[in-house]
Amino acid sequence: MAKQFKRKSNGVSESNRKRGRQELRKVTRTAARKQQQDENHEDDLNVNNDSEEDNSGKEIDEEDEEGERDDNRGKAYSALLTLLKSEHKEKPKNVTFGSSSQVEKANASDSEDDGIAGANVDEEEEEGEIDNNVDENEIVSESDDDDDEDATNRLSTDPFESHFNLPSDDYLAKEEKLVLKDNEKWRTVDKQTYSDLAISSLVQLPPGEPLNPPLLKSSKLSEYTIKKRVLDSYEQAYGTGLSDLESTLINPILNYRDVNFQYKSFKNKFYRRLYTLHALNHIFKTRDRILKNTAKLHAAKEDSEELELRDQGFTRPKVLIMLPTRDACYEVVEQLIKLSGTEQQENKKKFNDQFYVKATPPATKPEDFRDAFKGNNNDFFCIGLKFTRKSLKLYSSFYSSDIILASPIGLSMILENPDKKKRQYDFLSSIEVLIVDKCNQIEMQNWDHVNTVMKYLNKVPKEFHDADFSRIRMWSINDQAKLLRQTLVFCEYLTPSINNLISSKSYNLSGKVKFKPIINSENSMMNSIGLKIKQIFQRFDSQSPLQDPDSRYKYFINAILPSLLKTSSYEDGIMIFIPSYFDYLRVKNYLKTSTKFTFGSIDEYSSQSKLTKTRQEFASGKIKLLLYTERLHYFRRYEISGVKTLIMYGLPSNPLFYKELIRFIGKSVFKEECDLDLALVKILFSKWDAVNLEKIVGNERAPVLCNSMNELYEFR
């Protein structure tokens, strides 16, 4: 047993416990916060400090007490950290929304980084020896689910088996050349429109021969090959049938195709129970196959036979779920517990203390804002989940976890630790299902961290952690795992960065399915504003997406700014909304050095005093022109007073923002500060803005605006 150490209070105030989103605005981390080192160890680095509780490291659960004692002898410091931190509670606190404290700095010290990269990852837990010391009773009980299935038939009818276990080495080598080396174009093979569901789908297959798993399709989950314990839990909670939308979505998910699904509203959370069901089904099938093959190998050994059964990757974790906040993580873990059928959950109290906070933003804020920032909106976490036949362990070591849930920034700080000796990425080498949920929130934080994670995903490990190479699949050894990894992406609305995750960074040979909402002129955002205000869409020429920022900037300073006062009916109350922070800096510098405009500028980095002062001066007319960024609006959702003319330097990525920005003018009209007929909204766009344009004007109008001869369109 590990020695017991007396825990000390770290003396950090409750106000310092709150971690905000300031870090996510920066690509790199900078200065240290000495006063919060211990606190950050305790709360913010939620990454598996329980080495003394979890040292089997096997892809099945075997409790080896002797191995635990040996492992802990060399880890006194880790054990000390564990005991100091494991039961410190994060008390519910009063959350102030819309203040600078909500966007606190997350600059961590070196010792903080040590905690991320060390305590949860560097634990040697005999990874790879997963077929030793297996309880044969456990094998039998695990196999009970499939007593009625014929093993040979299952290989041809179960997408899990056909996707991961049937592809030949020659086939994968051929596809690797076409997909990864030659970058051959993927083929669009099917387009479907579901008018009653208001969505459409597009199916793409890789060049050459697709994997072609058995494409099961049914409105009943019982007709899919789902583990009994998961199916029973799901049907007990949600019934035996599926809605038309659920059936349409679950089909490509269970058939191991990549999926990009836009759920349109935060209120639509049905998709979450579908992907958690799939994740659990995948974990339990992987475990079941390993147990059965281990039994076969033991039997063959007794009979002096030689068998080659490959059923594993380099490391145990098979599912990675990326989420924006601890509250989102809490909800997903609760869903996993609900569907897993586990009788007990280890470290559940600690998890609740660190991930759950009963807090909601003010009722005056929009509903989507209140949902995004409710509960514990700390964006720095990383936690492993380990399943046994009857229990779930939270805070398991990464190398002994089945599922890892993490924020992109929390994970990237482990992958790219400033101390190169402590960088770790091996635990991501064998991820077979990647799930990215609430992508729009993650993008508003910092999408660069997602790109960092993708860079290390399915990378051949630096060390092999005692892996049994006789059990590792050849496509893992040959660095072909990314060809079989499934990627599931869920977002409220599509953006180029999110679209790129499936289009350019996923290579699943089973194919890709992209779902898109059908937005016509009737249900478009423009039609829901409720104000008959002049809206002018001005198109400018842009030769490529890479040249688009420069083309937009040149058009703005040469065509829009010089005529701004002439086209506007008012000399004051001019707001320029700029989605990109880099474009914002560029325009701000030009206004400062090359014009005589009396202007103010506020962004997500502005202090609270500057935000208040600038808004007051703009509302009073002292400042004639105001620069305003999209990320500031996302994090604060201000209602700016005094707006009479609105210039959108670019279209907002969130269509709701379009309505909210235009209603700034409606507020001025209501206060009789301007005339509705004289107010003006002008939007700059290019043909590369088609995705954002569709969300605002509809699928029918967007192609016309992007491709017709006319460059200017007016709507009311």
UniProtKB/Swiss-Prot annotation:
InterPro entries: P-loop_NTPase, UTP25, UTP25_C, UTP25_NTPase-like. Keywords: Nucleus, Ribonucleoprotein, Ribosome biogenesis, rRNA processing. Pfam families: Utp25_C, UTP25_NTPase-like. One of its GO terms (molecular function) is rRNA binding. DEAD-box RNA helicase-like protein required for pre-18S rRNA processing, specifically at sites A0, A1, and A2. Belongs to the UTP25 family. This is U3 small nucleolar RNA-associated protein 25. It comes from Candida albicans (strain SC5314 / ATCC MYA-2876) (Yeast). The gene is UTP25.
